[in-house]
Amino acid sequence: MPEIIVLDTHIWFWLMTQDFQEIPDLWQTAIETAPQVGVSAISCYEIALASQKGRLELPCPLSEWLKEALLPSGIELLPLTPEITIRAVNLVPIHKDPFDRLIIATALEYEAKLASVDNLFSKYPELENYLM
């Protein structure tokens, strides 16, 4: 299976808004050179919700931002599948955020590296060889 990197929502947002100081340099290089980079479909909802609630400011309308932040930028939208939902509900409930559990399950399903600065992710033994 080719190496894929799954971006947590905040990493995706920082990349698209060029807020590079938040992303470790090694990660940025790995993301730029990876054969495949993707985000969980739930990340689109997470961005939309955060924008609606005023927790983040987008430089353009949401629909335009989402379109530009995906394929034109080289980011693949990874679908939410039944297998991913089953993995997510079967994870040990370390992380209470269902969005993050779906992102973790997406990375596991794709056997992908996961780029996230969420400190709870490292508590999942399943992610031991997958976290960047």
Segments predicted by a language model, with ranges:
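Short, well-structured N-terminal submotif of metal-dependent ribonuclease cores
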Residues: M1-V39, K53-E68, Y124
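Acidic, PIN/NYN-like endoribonuclease modules and their adjacent C-terminal/linker elements
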Residues: P2-I4, I104-M132
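Histidine- and aromatic-rich ligand-binding microenvironments
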Residues: D8, S40, K96-D97, D118
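Generic structural signal for small/hydrophobic residues in well-ordered secondary structure
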Residues: D8-T9, I47, A88, A107
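Alpha-helix capping/helix-boundary segments
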Residues: I11, S43-C44, I84, I103, ...
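Conserved beta-strand segments of alpha/beta enzyme cores
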Residues: Q36, E76, E128-N129
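Active-site neighborhoods of divalent-metal-dependent phosphate/nucleic-acid chemistry enzymes
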Residues: P59-S63, L71-V117
